[in-house]
Swiss-Prot record:
Positions with biased composition (Acidic residues): 202-211
Residue ranges of the region described as Disordered: 147-170, 185-223
Protein name according to UniProt: Protein UNIFOLIATA
Function according to Swiss-Prot or TrEMBL: May regulate indeterminacy during leaf and flower development.
Similarity-based family: Belongs to the FLO/LFY family.
Amino acid sequence: MDPDAFTASLFKWDPRTVLSTAPSPRPQLLDYAVTPTTAPMTYHPARLPRELGGLEELFQAYGIRYYTAAKIAELGFTVSTLVDMKDDELDDMMNSLSQIFRWDLLVGERYGIKAAIRAERRRLDEEEIKRRGLLSGDTTNALDALSQEGLSEEPVVQREKEAMGSGGGSTWEVAVVEERRKRQQIRRRRMKMKGNDHGENEEGEEEEEDNISGGGVGGGERQREHPFIVTEPAEVARGKKNGLDYLFHLYEQCREFLIQVQAIAKERGEKCPTKVTNQVFRYAKKAGASYINKPKMRHYVHCYALHCLDEEVSNELRRGFKERGENVGAWRQACYKPLVAIAARQGWDIDAIFNAHPRLSIWYGPTKLRQLCHAERNGAAASSSVSFGTTHLPF
């Protein structure tokens, strides 16, 4: 064999082998290039709920692209965060998305994000209303059971214990429902009393609402912090609380508001109120005097009455309590005794005393003051001494 021929055969170029072997690396390169693009497409559905935190369900029906939701999730936003955000905060979030990721948001996506969040808020609100409706229905049945005569309250207490044990926290719901039920009863009484005289109706409403505001869930007088401190006449109070001169000035403001309400009623041809009623308090609130409210003014009206009927006794009482450092609650209770003494000298008719005074005629006499006068009159009638009713009540 020729050695040159053997050597030449080793280096002979065969175009068929070149054509058959050359294209083989290209599919590998194509597979390598195509594989990364197809693999995430098959992997995304399994990772959607875990990666986006529910954003895909929130934005799915509003034309939001998947990658837009993914970018929002990368910024750390969740469904709960977006629902609690305001509109301007959502605008800042979308602007940050465009600036940080250079991601162009479509106009429809901007509106779609806000629309999806509003829809989610409505859905959550509806679920909360339904949940509260179920709780209030259960607690209303429990309260109705207590309202029946002859029934024990042990089943109701047992239900409350079971609800507390299950983590329902229905004790607060019970208190809210009971307060709501009381107010509904008051409204029904008002509807029945519409045929009565306007003044008597208004007075009954005030007494009932005083009982509601003064009683807690379990009944009894609610202990509230007094917003005033005992001050001497013309003394300026220091600190967060106001003095008694400011308290008496509030009653003068109520008189001015009553005059304005009467003028408006005359212009409209309506019935003019002759006393400070709910209509006056509502007008004061609309006028910006929200610090004037009925519970406060009814609570200290007898103190203002003593100030108007006998200013010297009122000032002396204020000085004495200021020197002893007593609070305004004790001063308020002490104001009853001089008023009972004044009523004893004028036939025990506290309403006539109020109506005869120009500054007190617009106020209803306190129920407690009437009760004290009635009790003192009975004691005076049972006593053999004519002056017993006044001598045992020195200031």
